[in-house]
UniProtKB/Swiss-Prot annotation:
Compartment annotation: Cytoplasm
Binding site for L-citrulline: Y85, N121, R125, S173, S182, E258, Y270
Protein name, UniProt field: Argininosuccinate synthase
PANTHER family xrefs: ARGININOSUCCINATE SYNTHASE (PTHR11587:SF2)
PROSITE patterns tied to this protein: ARGININOSUCCIN_SYN_1 (PS00564), ARGININOSUCCIN_SYN_2 (PS00565)
Main subcellular location: cytoplasm
Quaternary structure, from the entry: Homotetramer.
Any one Gene Ontology cellular component term annotated for this protein: cytoplasm
Entry-linked Pfam families: Arginosuc_syn_C, Arginosuc_synth
GO biological process: argininosuccinate metabolic process; L-arginine biosynthetic process; urea cycle
Catalysed reaction equations from the record: L-citrulline + L-aspartate + ATP = 2-(N(omega)-L-arginino)succinate + AMP + diphosphate + H(+)
Sequence positions that bind L-aspartate: T117, N121, D122
Family: Belongs to the argininosuccinate synthase family. Type 1 subfamily.
Length: 401
């Protein structure tokens, strides 16, 4: 009997390697591995999938698509879940789901699978995205279904000749892409315990960072970062370069206890050196290029966008509407921002734009002052008219009583 095809989102780790063997009982498994900037040797991962039992192993380089279509809107919104988490893993999941569906269609597969556990956010993100893109596809979650302990999973791997990763004894659960690195589990599960240095990989300890500050100038065109110190880069490459530059100064460490979608609190340690610099630089440029009403309203939608992405609703109609508003706000976000990097800090020290709304002649207190001071009197009277009327009415009522 011919087996039906299944496309598995494959990482090369123990869970998805065991999943290939487990799923192969009922399906012809096609392993799909995507490069979103995690820095792995994907050729090794491709061969490992075939060794374990996949009938085909596909590797896709999606770094540019990830940067331009998923990271960029989050950057332009200044999106942070609960004001802290810059959506590192949450941004890559809808793209991975899109590619799962695309390959499933190309291969004539009837099902897709992922390696998420039953208590994380990613299972929701994958499955809701697949349902939005093609609800006819079956989604299988082997790790959630088999309910093995780690010891039982290792025993199964050994019995079925599945290679055991050399980093299996690491206490951490790590996910990484262009936008940063997420780390949880092990000693990090105690929110009182300070993260040890081995919990970090992209950043040096701030106290060990250089004693000499470094300044970088980020160039933007219509809200898109396009250059570092005058050198132009595609967005994915620009983020990668900034990860190296800012990481060397200990910039971008975040220690956060967040409220997961599934109802639990989770302590996470994030590293996002490039993201930290870009988010600060972009926000600084908007202070001189957005009008007051847009600048005050945009953070409301930024919070909504962050929660929408975090909750796995990238492919929901709301996201399309939020992006439409965002596009309208970015046309004038063009200019340069200077950022100083020093011992864990990224400090904006200057911003300039050819379309800046900051008028020094209106702002100055020198003799160059062009502000119409006489106009202030009438403005104040009208601005306070409602409150002064209210006060007058209630003062009269008090007299009557």
């Amino acid at each position: 009997m011919t087996k039906q095809k299944l496309i598995l989102a494959y990482s090369g780790g123990l869970d998805t390697s065991v999943a290939i063997k487990w799923l192969s009982k009922d399906y012809d498994v096609v392993a799909l591995c995507m490069d979103v900037g995690e820095g792995k040797d994907l050729s090794v991962i491709k061969e490992k999938a075939l060794l374990v039992g996949a009938i085909e192993s596909i590797v896709l380089d999606v770094k540019d698509e990830f940067a331009n279509d998923f990271v960029l809107p989050a950057l332009q919104y200044g999106a942070h879940y609960e004001g802290a988490y810059p959506l590192i893993s949450a941004l890559s999941r809808p793209l991975i789901a899109e590619k799962l569906v695309e390959v499933a269609h190309a291969q004539g597969a009837t099902a897709v699978a992922h390696g998420c556990t039953g208590k994380g956010n990613d299972q929701v993100r994958f499955e809701v995205s697949v349902a939005a893109l093609d609800p006819s596809l079956e989604v299988i979650a082997p790790v959630r279904e088999w309910k093995w302990s780690r010891e039982e999973e290792i025993a199964y791997a050994k019995e079925n000749n599945v290679p055991i990763p050399i980093n299996l004894n690491s206490p951490y659960s790590i996910d990484m892409n262009l936008w940063g690195r997420s780390n949880e589990c092990g000693v990090l599960e105690n929110p009182w315990t300070e993260p040890p240095q081995d919990a970090y990989a992209l950043t040096v300890a701030p106290e060990d960072a250089p004693d000499q500050a470094e300044e970088v100038i980020i160039g933007f065109e219509a809200g898109v970062p396009v250059s570092i110190n005058g050198t132009a880069y595609p967005l994915a490459k620009l983020i990668t370069e900034l990860n190296i530059i800012a990481g060397a100064h200990g910039v971008g460490r975040i220690d956060h206890v967040e409220n997961r979608l599934v109802g639990i609190k989770s302590r996470e340690v994030y590293e996002c050196p490039g993201a930290t610099v870009l988010l600060k630089a972009h926000a600084a440029l908007e202070t001189i290029t957005l009008t007051k009403d847009v600048a005050h309203f945009k953070p409301i939608l930024s919070k909504q966008y962050a929660e929408t992405i975090y909750n796995g609703l990238f492919h929901a109609p709301l996201t399309k509407g939020l992006k439409a508003f965002l596009t309208a706000t970015q046309q004038d976000v063009t200019g340069e921002v200077r950022v100083k990097l020093y011992k864990g800090n990224a400090t904006v020290t200057g911003r300039q734009s050819a379309v800046s709304l900051y008028d020094e002649k209106l702002a100055t207190y020198t003799k160059e002052d062009a502000f119409d001071h006489e106009a202030a009197k009438g403005f104040i009277k009208l601005h306070g008219l409602a409150i002064s009327t209210h006060a007058s009415v209630h003062r009269q009522e008090g007299v009557k009583k």
